[in-house]
């Protein structure tokens, strides 16, 4: 089976004037299809930087990256953007929904061709996904009128719209109270189990990490631990 992520020797150095910050110092990471993995680490340890590199939003200073068996680190910007839109899904701490558009439109829009409308098939899939995340009664609500947890459910439905190979979630529960955070994580577990979606979730919440199938720890620019079934019950 092809691995969804194969990263080898990933390094990242940021330059600000004369100052150099070495954030990632050689990351090797393999993630198989259907995994639900959490990455934990102190604030500033480089979690978002690594997710941005894997999400093709940022290029590594060194190292190689393959997603679903395809080398992506040396692609042109245009091909990287295309790969990102077609093969990856994103969930961020701040959902970035369009407040005046409905839940359905927020899920379907990113899948529409630039300048194109939402096709009937996209509408149907967006509605199905919103039902899947428990929002069948909020499909036509403007995003601004949804609660924080509901908005994050819309963001998950949106991430699933293109049937991505990998869903990258950066602190998806960071802005939610305990109960909403648990429900959002339950939903990701369900989508993982029932649809085989592969997740890489970065979180500073140990409660979230304990309920993922694998916990990776990032410390001082290196992956220092890799524990399968950290909660001991999946
Ligand atoms: P985390 O998500 O684990 O909190 P980040 O990946 O956001 O950590 O940041 C890791 C380190 O890299 C921090 O010291 C941060 O200041 C630095 N950093 C992140 N992005 C940039 C940037 N664009 N330019 C310079 N330094 C950056
Ligand atoms: Mg971060």
Curated annotation (Swiss-Prot):
Domain ABC transporter per the UniProt entry, residue ranges: 5-231
Family matches, as SMART domains: AAA
Topology class, membrane: Peripheral membrane protein
Gene Ontology cellular-component terms listed: plasma membrane
Sites where the protein binds ATP: 41-48
Alphabetical list of InterPro entries matching this protein: AAA+_ATPase, ABC_transporter-like_ATP-bd, ABC_transporter-like_CS, ABC_transpr_LolD-like, MacB-like_ATP-bd, P-loop_NTPase
Domain of life: Bacteria
Keyword Endoplasmic reticulum (UniProt): no
Predominant localisation class: membrane
CDD domains membership: ABC_MJ0796_LolCDE_FtsE (cd03255)
Enzyme Commission no: 7.6.2.-
Complex and partners: The complex is composed of two ATP-binding proteins (LolD) and two transmembrane proteins (LolC and LolE).
PANTHER family in the cross-refs: IMPORT ATP-BINDING PROTEIN (PTHR24220), LIPOPROTEIN-RELEASING SYSTEM ATP-BINDING PROTEIN LOLD (PTHR24220:SF689)
Family indicated by similarity: Belongs to the ABC transporter superfamily. Lipoprotein translocase (TC 3.A.1.125) family.
Function: Part of the ABC transporter complex LolCDE involved in the translocation of mature outer membrane-directed lipoproteins, from the inner membrane to the periplasmic chaperone, LolA. Responsible for the formation of the LolA-lipoprotein complex in an ATP-dependent manner.
Protein name from the UniProt record: Lipoprotein-releasing system ATP-binding protein LolD 1
Organism: Caulobacter vibrioides (strain ATCC 19089 / CIP 103742 / CB 15) (Caulobacter crescentus)
Gene from which the chain derives: lolD1
């Amino acid at each position: 089976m092809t691995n969804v992520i194969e990263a080898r020797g990933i390094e990242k150095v940021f330059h600000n004037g004369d100052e150099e910050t070495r954030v990632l110092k050689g990351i090797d990471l393999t993630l198989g299809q259907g995994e639900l993995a959490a990455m934990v680490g102190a604030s500033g340890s480089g979690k978002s930087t690594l997710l941005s590199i894997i999400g093709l939003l940022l290029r590594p200073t060194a190292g190689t990256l393959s997603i679903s068996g395809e080398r992506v680190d040396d692609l042109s910007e245009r091909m990287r953007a295309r790969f990102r839109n077609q093969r990856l899904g994103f969930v961020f701490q701040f959902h970035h929904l369009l407040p005046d558009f409905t839940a359905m439109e927020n899920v379907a829009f990113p899948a529409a061709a630039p300048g194109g409308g939402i096709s009937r098939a996209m509408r149907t899939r967006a509605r199905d996904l919103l039902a899947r995340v428990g929002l069948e009664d909020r499909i036509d609500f403007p995003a601004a009128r949804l609660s924080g947890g509901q908005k994050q459910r819309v963001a998950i439905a949106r991430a699933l719209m293109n049937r991505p190979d990998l869903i990258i979630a950066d602190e998806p529960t960071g802005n939610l109270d305990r109960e909403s955070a648990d429900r959002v994580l339950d939903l990701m577990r369900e989508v993982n189990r029932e649809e085989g979606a592969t997740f890489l979730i970065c979180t500073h919440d140990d409660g979230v990490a304990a309920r993922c199938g694998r916990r990776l720890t990032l410390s001082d620019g290196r992956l220092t631990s890799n524990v399968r079934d950290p909660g001991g019950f999946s």
